[in-house]
C-alpha cells in the first residue's frame, strides 16, 4: 500500500514569503519548504493497481492552468486546531481542477473523503498541543497578510511516507496543465 495524494507544489518565490512567518510560529512542527503544497485530493493508502489507475486517469485530464493566490493565516481542526495554514483564495479554475482530479480518482476506484474543498497550504502541524496565546497572536497578526500569487502549470501525484521527524513527499508523476490557447 502507498499513502498518496495529488497536489500543487508551491514555488520557491512563494515559500520564501512563507518562511519568515513559519519562523515566528512559537510551537508546532514546521512543514519544510520542499513539502509545501496545496492538496487537491488525498488518496490515503492505496494499492499499486489503484495507484496506476489514478495515474492513467490523471494523464487523460487536460484542465487549464490555474491562478493560486495565498492570503492570510488560519487554523484548521475546529475547536482543537491541528494545523496552521496559509489560506488560498478560492476561484473557479481551482475548483474545476479539484473536481476534475476528484473525478479521476473516483473513476479509478479510490474512495475519497466527501468534504468541502477549502484550499490551503499547511505551514505547521500542532499534533496534540493546545494553541498558545503567542501562537494565536501570530495567526491574528497575519490574518489578512498577502503571501503572493502564482500560475500553477501542473499538478503532481505524491507518495507520502510518514516518519517520526515528519512526512517525506516523493513525486511519482506530474501532469501539465493547459496554458491558454492550447
Model-inferred region functions:
Residues 1-182:
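Histidine-dependent nucleotide/RNA phosphoesterase domain, centered on the 2H-phosphoesterase fold
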Amino acid at each position: 500500500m502507498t499513502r498518496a495524494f495529488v497536489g500543487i507544489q508551491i514555488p520557491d518565490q512563494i515559500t520564501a514569503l512563507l518562511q519568515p512567518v513559519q519562523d515566528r510560529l512559537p510551537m508546532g512542527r514546521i512543514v519544510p519548504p520542499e513539502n509545501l503544497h496545496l492538496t487537491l485530493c488525498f488518496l490515503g493508502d492505496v494499492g499499486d493497481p489503484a495507484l496506476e489507475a489514478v495515474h492513467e486517469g490523471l494523464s487523460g485530464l487536460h484542465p487549464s492552468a490555474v491562478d493560486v493566490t495565498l492570503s492570510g493565516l488560519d487554523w484548521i481542526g475546529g475547536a482543537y486546531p491541528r494545523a496552521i495554514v496559509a489560506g488560498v483564495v478560492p476561484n473557479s479554475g481551482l475548483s474545476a481542477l479539484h473536481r476534475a482530479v476528484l473525478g479521476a480518482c473516483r473513476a479509478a476506484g479510490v474512495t475519497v473523503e466527501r468534504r468541502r474543498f477549502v484550499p490551503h497550504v499547511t505551514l505547521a502541524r500542532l499534533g496534540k498541543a493546545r494553541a498558545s496565546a503567542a501562537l494565536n497572536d501570530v495567526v491574528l497578526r497575519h490574518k489578512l497578510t498577502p503571501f503572493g500569487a502564482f500560475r500553477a502549470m501542473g499538478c503532481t501525484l505524491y507518495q507520502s511516507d510518514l516518519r517520526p521527524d515528519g512526512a517525506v513527499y516523493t513525486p511519482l508523476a506530474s501532469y501539465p496543465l493547459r496554458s491558454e490557447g492550447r
